[in-house]
Amino acid sequence: MYLARINLDPARSSGMDQWAAMGQAVRRAVDPDPASEARVLWARTSPGTLVISSDTAPAWGKVPGATSAAIHPLSRHPEGESVRWELISAPTARRGKRVPLAEDEFEDWLSGKFAGALDLTSAKWKRLGGRPARYHFTGEAVVRDSDALQELCLNGIGAGTATGAGLLLVSPLAPQ
């Protein structure tokens, strides 16, 4: 698995502010075969930054507006390591149909999604908009199970993974 941070020129990435268009461009950059089952997760973390997690290194030059990229193998985190995490997601639950969660349910939702992989120590979020509403979550945690965390990073969290939600980014927390 690879993690790519692609720098975008917002002036040259016209149309890429639409989730569906960005999803198609990312899929083509990773694997041009539309029937492929290659795992691909992505998130637009800022207007000038696109992050992609995929089975193969993306051909970042195929992404409209891409100016440069840093591509690295996906890191593994050992049990007991303190980490910083980041997630863009639209928290929902099935209640007959998929419905958005209220903000006071977010910490329980996150704890449930991270169960077994991470022990949550802090979480905060900012509403990004959309329907259902997307949120940018950040926080700190301790790795409980390295393999379970790797699966979360590979498969994504929550609904909307094809449209730029669900990518969990994890990095070591700097010692204090």
Where are these regions (language model features)?
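RNA-interacting cores
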Residues: 1-176
